Amino acid sequence: MEKYHSDQEYEEVITDQLGDMQLRENLRSAMDTLRANRKNLIKNRYSEWENLRELGKEVKLKILSRLDEYLELFEKNATQNGFKIHYAKDGDEANEIIYNLAKEKNIKRILKQKSMASEEIGLNHYLKEKGIQAQETDLGELIIQLINEHPVHIVVPAIHKNRKQIGKIFEEKLNAAYEEEPEKLNAIARKHMRKEFESFKMGISGVNFAIANEGAIWLVENEGNGRMSTTACDVHVAICGIEKLVENFDDAAILNNLLAPSAVGVPITCYQNIITGPRKEGDLDGPKEAHIILLDNNRSNILADEKYYRALSCIRCGTCLNHCPVYDKIGGHAYLSTYPGPIGVVVSPQLFGLNNYGHIPNLCSLCGRCTEVCPVEIPLAELIRDLRSDKVGEGRGVVKGAKSTQHSGMEKFSMKMFAKMASDGAKWRFQLKMAQFFSPLGKLLAPILPLVKEWASVRTLPNMDTSLHAKVQHLEGVIYE
């Protein structure tokens, strides 16, 4: 489960990540590849990409506008299909439901497909404390589980590791011969996982789309582990955020056509798993029981807000991370949240409280690239600006925990004075002259002045040079008026 993170904690982890040159090299190489793949695919294959984005936006906004009705419809149809539906108001309830299902059947080992919802609720840690092993089956998730790390990316969990590092991890943790060729590394993981599939009785997955009209769930993946996790075990449990609903298969297909191109620059994922319930009479495979946990975890409160509800449109493609100039320098771990990158900056304070994630809105350059590339047109940059306003007490104050993050009266007064000076040319030039004169004294006092000491603890105040205004006047060939 998520916890409070101080500004100092953020400063330490960001400094550490920036100093890891191998991490930065790995991230930059991966981000460059993902961006190029997306750009080339859209250019060569999707002449109506912007129209498709608009359709995707409409699909999500339609479902969010009547989510309560669609939840009831989904529950009715899924129940008729044989699913057992559970509602969880938060992560604690979701974890307890899964534990009780396992306890009831004396299950001590559980297979897991990649699921950000399970990361959000801290499922693996919870089960471990209860004496139950949760075994990851996604290749990226397996890698980070072996080294006890959290996912660094919402689509590619181990994207911060190169093949040589992965080879060493497999050598140390799986007692395999050192390899660094991707095909051989995959073979090592496959051999390890095939043994696991034979002995597990419960499989846990996420959900990409929950189809209200059909009472079915749709899972996409590239490795086949999802199909094994949901069909080879006696019990399948799917954790589904309530925002994952869509009305029908046509709507789901629109979002699916946006997902893979945006995520990794391919037309479609290798495996499309549409699950309509447990094994029926005459079926050769499939689980004997199928459960769906509909997870709220503060999503209802986000939905009720006139602006932030748009964040619930997210289809978890990760393209905003791939295009973010902050993320590709510091990676996902620096956000100290299940959800990193621009979408994480928006949803983490909503889900877990701005009081716990007060620093995260600062991890943004406000360049707006995330908004430009989002496949369902979430105005991420605008929402991040709103969060910053809420953080300092200048916004609507609707975010969970916002009241405890607001600036002091002195800070508010200082920023208002700065805004007045910065918007008046004459006052601004006068202040620049004063800043040049008092620059040495400012450097000396900055570490102890209440309003700037935190800033000064991680930054060096530069020498105030002659103003640009003055420099322009002395340029040859420039007429200054």
Model-identified regions with their sequence ranges:
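Predominant activation on well-ordered alpha-helical scaffold segments within soluble catalytic domains
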Residues: 124, 250-253, 318, 381-384, ...
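The feature marks the mature, well-folded catalytic cores of soluble enzymes
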Residues: 1-307
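A glycine-rich phosphate-binding loop feature that marks nucleotide/adenosyl-phosphate handling sites
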Residues: 93, 269-282, 316, 327-331, ...
